[in-house]
Swiss-Prot record:
Keywords: Cell membrane, Ion transport, Membrane, Sodium, Sodium transport, Symport, Transmembrane, Transmembrane helix, Transport. This is Solute carrier family 13 member 2. It comes from Rattus norvegicus. Expressed in large and small intestine and in the kidney proximal tubules. Residues 188-208 are annotated as: Disordered. Low-affinity sodium-dicarboxylate cotransporter, that mediates the entry of citric acid cycle intermediates, such as succinate, citrate, fumarate and alpha-ketoglutarate (2-oxoglutarate) into the small intestine and renal proximal tubule. Transports the dicarboxylate into the cell with a probable stoichiometry of 3 Na(+) for 1 divalent dicarboxylate, rendering the process electrogenic. Citrate is transported in protonated form as a divalent anion, rather than the trivalent form which is normally found in blood. Has a critical role in renal dicarboxylate transport. It is found in: Apical cell membrane. The gene is Slc13a2.
């Protein structure tokens, strides 16, 4: 029997995949309705996503098989959901991000900002957080963290080395990056036998450095998650929301676009980032703000050491290449086109130049992203000239384009594209089967709870759930249910969908919650308890910041104070309950 458990554990994923469908079979066999069939599919996929018995993208393919066989949707209708406009926006945005990463433009931006902000302890934390958050707005959180953590550790090692030299009366003329961790300090007697140096001030300095190292590591992974919420393409849950809104409410008039999302989420990100900086500063640096800002004894020497590390890394990048300059121009052009396509407060180029009969823009944010990506495939990475092939002297060779398909194929997370499509297919199947309407009817008692309280409770639920489940899977599962609930109680759907989408990015407590946390944890120096202690209060702060945003500046942006006509599932019910159709009345 003792040898049975290791075997079961080793084959646990196979057992889960085989047993789960059988265990859930009573639901469709006893309740033979389309709603039950769809519920069976959703519960099965939710459990597989939570356990990760199959890769997330593989589970996302289940609707292609289950929905046609159960009579929920035609196969052709299901497959369309896997490559919608939101998927195109995701692919196009990632292509631009891949170009930025491929030509090291993100590293140049990071080092330049750190040189400007300075390297005093509190400012160093702020500098790393600002840079990481800004980069996470445009490229993946994982790539940003993977780049920033080594830079942070190089600075920390130089700071530690500088401390030792200052205490020992030595100078540190060289500031090269150290790849190995500094050895433990020992002193030797005349006989050559090492003994520990029980210097109390030095022990205290070592403890301070360790706490500062923990704080810097956590500030990088936390700001990567926080920064991703600021833009529509910053992290995948944001795109899941846009896709779900467009799928569930086709007549919404493109209410969630790049400009409207930025107006809502960017101020939220700034507030949360500053509060996170203050919390991490207090937790790991203490409340001696004079010392935190570098006015203590010997701080100038340490500051110069860290500054030289960053300056050396920046110098190694060399001057900006033609490719970097081109990517910068195209990146800025992309952002400008996104903002001006349909800004909302003045007619955009999409509404005026490319409008249809109804006056609506025929171009989308995905159109812009793909256009800029195509340009990157056309422009050469070097100024055209008479270049010779080094392998074949005398033969001319054209430089590669700024973006090549090999580069894109190697770095593009195609699994996320499929995962997005699976979420949209689930939402569509839930709508067509009638499951969404059934859930909405069951959730009508929530209309007696104030909307603000409902939003807070749901945010806390999502924030807890996302600690142990992929944030993409979390939003994919919950957003259709939240939309149905909002329709049933005549509440603006975005009033609950927007904050819960942001809450899915509040994965601060566990290393397994999100890849940036795992990357930082893998570098060492952190325990799970350290991350949980810092992340618990940060989760609470995040929910409060989101609650503030959804009840203030978000109301005029998305018109959250009314129940929109495009969200009516039962018009007569909403007309009979007008008190529930406005957010401020329930606050």
């Amino acid at each position: 029997m003792a040898t049975c458990w290791p075997a079961l554990w080793a084959y646990r994923f196979y057992l889960i995949v085989l047993c789960l469908p059988i265990f859930l079979l009573p639901l469709p066999l006893i309740v033979q309705t389309k709603e039950a069939y769809c519920a069976y599919s959703i519960i099965l996929m939710a459990l597989l996503w939570c356990t990760e018995a199959l890769p997330l993208a593989v589970t996302a393919l289940f609707p292609i098989v289950l929905f046609p066989l159960m009579g929920i949707m035609d196969a052709s209708e299901v497959c369309i959901e896997y490559f919608k406009d939101t998927n195109i926006l995701f692919v196009g945005g990632l292509m631009v991000a891949i170009a930025v990463e491929h030509w090291n433009l993100h590293k140049r931006i990071a080092l330049q900002v750190l040189l400007i902000i300075g390297v005093r302890p509190a400012l160093l934390l702020l500098g790393f957080m600002l840079v990481t958050a800004f980069l996470s707005m445009w490229i993946s959180n994982t790539a940003t963290t993977a780049m920033m953590v080594p830079i942070g550790h190089a600075v920390l090692e130089q700071l530690q080395g500088s401390k030792k030299d200052v205490e020992g009366g030595n100078n540190n003329p060289t500031f090269e990056l150290q790849e190995e961790c500094p050895q433990k300090e020992v002193t030797k007697l005349d006989n050559g036998q090492p003994v520990s140096a029980p210097s109390e001030p030095r022990t205290q300095k070592t403890q301070e450095h360790h706490r500062f190292s923990q704080g810097l590591s956590l500030c990088i992974c936390y700001s990567a998650s926080i920064g991703g919420i600021a833009t529509l393409t910053g992290t995948t849950p944001n795109l899941v929301l846009q896709g779900q809104v467009n799928s569930l409410f086709p007549q919404n008039g493109n209410v969630v676009n790049f400009a409207s999302w930025f107006g809502f989420a960017f101020p939220t990100m700034i507030i949360l980032l500053l509060l996170a900086w203050l919390w991490l500063q207090v937790l790991f640096l203490g409340v001696n703000f004079r010392k935190n800002f570098g006015f203590g004894e010997g701080e100038e020497e340490r500051k110069q050491a860290a500054f030289q590390v960053i300056k050396t890394q920046y110098r190694l990048l060399g001057p900006m290449s033609f490719a970097e300059k081109t990517v910068t121009v195209l990146f800025v052009l992309l952002v400008v086109l996104w903002f001006t396509r349909e800004p909302g407060f003045f007619p955009g180029w999409g509404d005026t130049v490319f409008a249809n009969e109804k006056g609506q823009s025929m171009a989308s944010d995905g159109t812009v992203a793909i256009f800029i990506s195509l340009v990157m495939f056309i422009i050469p990475s070097k100024i055209p000239g008479l270049m010779q092939d080094p392998k074949k002297p005398g033969k001319l060779k054209a430089p590669p384009a700024i973006l090549t398909w090999k580069t894109v194929n190697d770095k593009m997370p195609w699994n996320i594209v499929i995962l997005l499509g699976g979420g949209f297919a689930l939402a569509k199947g839930s709508e067509q089967s009638g499951l969404s309407e059934w859930l909405g009817d069951k959730l009508t008692p929530l209309q007696h709870i104030p909307p603000s309280a409902t939003a807070v409770i749901l945010c806390l639920l999502i924030a807890i759930f996302t600690e142990c489940t992929s944030n993409v899977a979390t939003t994919t599962l919950f957003l259709p249910i939240l939309a149905s609930m909002a329709q049933a109680i005549c509440l603006h759907p975005l009033y609950v969908m927007l904050p819960c989408t942001l809450a899915a990015s509040l994965a601060f407590m566990l290393p397994v919650a999100t890849p940036p946390n795992a990357i930082v944890f893998s570098f060492g120096g952190l325990k799970v308890s350290d991350m949980a202690r810092a992340g618990f209060l940060l989760n609470i702060i995040g929910v409060l910041a989101i609650t503030l945003s959804i009840n203030s500046w978000s109301i005029p942006i998305f018109k959250l104070d009314t129940f929109p006509s495009w969200a009516h599932s039962n018009t007569s019910q909403c007309l009979l309950n007008p008190s529930n159709s406005t957010v401020p009345g329930g606050l």
